């Protein structure tokens, strides 16, 4: 397993095992961790996690579990048995669901992955929340869900970098994982609440999820190295 000290998590957002491994083979596991999301995991199942771990990568399993407490807790346990470094669940599943996941991991005999809560997806703005019956600013909803996550004993949160300062102030013990990271000059794509890597760390983020600026670069290894150098 790598001794990765970098905050960078590269999103392996690909439909096939071959495409994901083609990128992973260009990356140094000492400079980044990798994220396996719904598309890749559904296509490849648990074998992709085993293969990536065999290449030295710590794996963030980004499946955003959301179900009744026992079902979600058993899914988190299955992720731990795969040897993932980090796993996440939706905070909107509620206090009992998150607490059940934490309790299950506390009883797990092997290395325990970080248990991270998903607050408000970075693609969602106020009008999107209104469409699902929440007449509230995204940042206020994030703070409400963060309080639940803290009470449940979660290790951290997925949040946008704009929300990081308020979250660090309110819950300094929670580790913050931030998607929607774009180096200066990159396209925003479908994520709205974005900052550059340096801005995100300065705002209080602990881990940075970066996808297309690395995966679609002409030279992914060079793109990763440039971001690492920017962060010092």
Curated annotation (Swiss-Prot):
It catalyses: orotidine 5'-phosphate + H(+) = UMP + CO2. Homodimer. GO terms for molecular function: orotidine-5'-phosphate decarboxylase activity. This is Orotidine 5'-phosphate decarboxylase. The gene is pyrF. Keywords: Decarboxylase, Lyase, Pyrimidine biosynthesis. Pathway: Pyrimidine metabolism; UMP biosynthesis via de novo pathway; UMP from orotate: step 2/2. Gene3D superfamilies: Aldolase class I. PANTHER family: OROTIDINE 5'-PHOSPHATE DECARBOXYLASE. Catalyzes the decarboxylation of orotidine 5'-monophosphate (OMP) to uridine 5'-monophosphate (UMP). Substrate binds at residues 13, 35, 62-71, 122, 182, 191, 211-212. The keyword Transmembrane does not apply. GO terms for biological process: 'de novo' pyrimidine nucleobase biosynthetic process; 'de novo' UMP biosynthetic process. GO terms for cellular component: cytosol. SUPFAM superfamilies: Ribulose-phoshate binding barrel. The active site is at residue 64. Its EC number is 4.1.1.23. Belongs to the OMP decarboxylase family. Type 1 subfamily. It comes from Pseudomonas aeruginosa (strain ATCC 15692 / DSM 22644 / CIP 104116 / JCM 14847 / LMG 12228 / 1C / PRS 101 / PAO1).
